[in-house]
Amino acid sequence: MAKHPVPKKKTSKSKRDMRRSHHALTAPNLTECPQCHGKKLSHHICPNCGYYDGRQVLAV
C-alpha cells in the first residue's frame, strides 16, 4: 500500500490566516452612467441604457 505525504506539524492559526490574507474579495468599482444615472462598471457599456462614451452601442 502506498504511503501518502502528511504534514509533520500542525499549521498554526497565525500561519493559516497569513496564507489566506490575500483571499479577500474586492467590491466592484461602480460609477454613475451620465445618460440614465444608473450604476455601471467603469469602462463598460451601461446595462440599463446601452450607452458607452456618449453614444448608443447596444439596443436596450
UniProtKB/Swiss-Prot annotation:
Keywords: Metal-binding, Ribonucleoprotein, Ribosomal protein, RNA-binding, rRNA-binding, Zinc, Zinc-finger
Binding site for Zn(2+): C33, C36, C46, C49
Region (Disordered): 1-34
Molecular function as annotated in GO: rRNA binding; structural constituent of ribosome; zinc ion binding
Basic residues: compositionally biased ranges: 1-23
Cofactor-binding details, from the entry: Binds 1 zinc ion per subunit.
Annotated zinc fingers (C4-type), start-end: 33-49
Gene3D superfamilies, sorted: Single helix bin
A biological-process GO annotation: translation
Function: Forms a cluster with L17 and L22, and with L22, a pair of 'tweezers' that hold together all the domains of the 23S rRNA. Interacts with the antibiotic troleandomycin which blocks the peptide exit tunnel.
Family: Belongs to the bacterial ribosomal protein bL32 family.
HAMAP family: Ribosomal_bL32 (MF_00340)
Subunit structure: Part of the 50S ribosomal subunit. Contacts proteins L17 and L22.
Name under which the protein is recorded: Large ribosomal subunit protein bL32
